[in-house]
């Protein structure tokens, strides 16, 4: 019996009572507020993420030529963004055959677009772990600690215009993503949500995105490779909303 993949509803997530308590109910207004606060001097960890971001994107920009040792170092580099220690490939040596397959897959996903993604998925919008695409991505998950979060970050740094990062903060808004199939469903829903935002007011969205990108470049030394993609901007807002939800719950438990 074929399992139906999970469906993620971003709009419903933003309408949850715990979200509405901390937002204005208008995504573009919330976007301007949350992105504006990220460069606050008190947000040291957040600022550290923003500072290091373009360097990691640049590291993976020529992934088709990445060597075995640089792939391993790159995955450890990404885990510098995470609270958990990395157990690379379950502590087992990565075979040359698996490395070649991984490099080929990473080189391929660097070119993915929404059109390619839709063609790759089945009619139900799911990936199949038994197919060629699924096997390669399950191997990718394996080398990133068996973690969907780690895998999503690697995919994002490979192709920041298409793959959104997923973590526990975003889960607080849209729900949990536990499998490769569910991550694919999350990506598909993310792009549907993005279209709705842009259809609502693409000019205002672009103004806010560009203002934040320019502010980051000014703050961190006018880095020419400091690009905040549409995907990255929306993901950052969801991250900040989710983080605020988690922080408010902690405060409620320990007033």
Q: Model segments located where?
A:
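Short hydrophobic alpha-helical segments that form membrane-spanning helices or hydrophobic packing faces
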Residues: 150-157
């Amino acid at each position: 019996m074929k399992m139906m993949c999970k469906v993620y509803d971003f709009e419903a997530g933003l309408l949850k009572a715990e979200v509405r308590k901390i937002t204005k109910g208008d995504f573009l207004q919330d976007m301007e507020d949350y992105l504006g606060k990220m460069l606050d001097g008190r947000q040291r960890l957040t600022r550290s993420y923003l500072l290091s971001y373009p360097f990691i994107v640049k590291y993976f920009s020529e992934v088709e030529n990445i060597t075995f040792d640089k792939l391993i170092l790159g995955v450890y580099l990404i885990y510098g963004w995470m609270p958990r220690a990395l157990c690379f490939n379950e502590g087992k040596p990565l075979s040359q055959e698996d490395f070649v397959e991984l490099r080929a897959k990473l080189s391929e996903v660097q070119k993915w677009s929404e059109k390619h993604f839709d063609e790759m998925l089945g009619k139900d919008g799911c990936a199949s772990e038994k197919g060629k695409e699924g096997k390669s991505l399950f191997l990718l998950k394996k080398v990133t600690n068996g973690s969907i979060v780690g895998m999503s970050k690697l995919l994002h740094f490979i192709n920041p215009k298409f793959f959104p990062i997923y973590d526990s903060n975003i889960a607080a808004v849209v729900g949990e993503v536990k499998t490769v199939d569910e991550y694919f469903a999350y990506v598909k829903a993310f792009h549907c949500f993005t279209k709705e935002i842009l259809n609502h007011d693409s000019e205002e969205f672009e103004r806010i995105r560009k203002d934040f990108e320019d502010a980051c470049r000014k703050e961190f030394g006018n880095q020419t490779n400091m690009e905040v993609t549409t995907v990255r901007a929306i993901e950052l807002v969801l991250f900040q909303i989710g983080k605020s939800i988690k922080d408010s719950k902690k405060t409620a438990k320990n007033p």
